[in-house]
Amino acid sequence: EALKGDDQLAISEAVVRNFIADYFTWTNKDGNYEVGGLQYIYGPMFTSFQEQSRWEFYKDLDFYISQYGRENLLEVSDITITSSAVAGNFELYSGEEFASFYIETTWNYKPSPKIDVDSFQKTGYFTVINNNGRYEIAQFFDHYD
């Protein structure tokens, strides 16, 4: 729906929703090597983000699959945009600047009989950039200080 118009904020919100649905859902993953949502990450950060994810959020995925079965793992059930705004230019480490959008979100997981889904991340603070018409996540955090 967002892509039918040219509302950059709505497009950025859609990117974040799709990222959350793929990255934080484990029921469709075969192992910790299969990091979801990478297509929404700023291109030059792709490899480092994938590696960091495998050592952090995905580090125990293989164990969870073998102990509890993939069907009993995390599956995002709903996503709420709690705040969004045009954020001005965002400067990357390379010195490049891009138009950016700030998105705050919360989400929930389907209940699981095997794991405590409430012990996993359920909030995110995202910066989305317009990289020559391609909307990409340049950074995100699980808490805001």
Question: Where do the PLM segments sit?
Answer:
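A short, amphipathic edge element
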Residues: 65-89
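Generic local-structure boundary detector
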Residues: 26, 30, 34-37, 49-53, ...
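Exposed beta-sheet edge and beta->alpha loop/turn motif
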Residues: 82-145
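Core segments of small alpha/beta cavity-forming domains
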Residues: 1-72
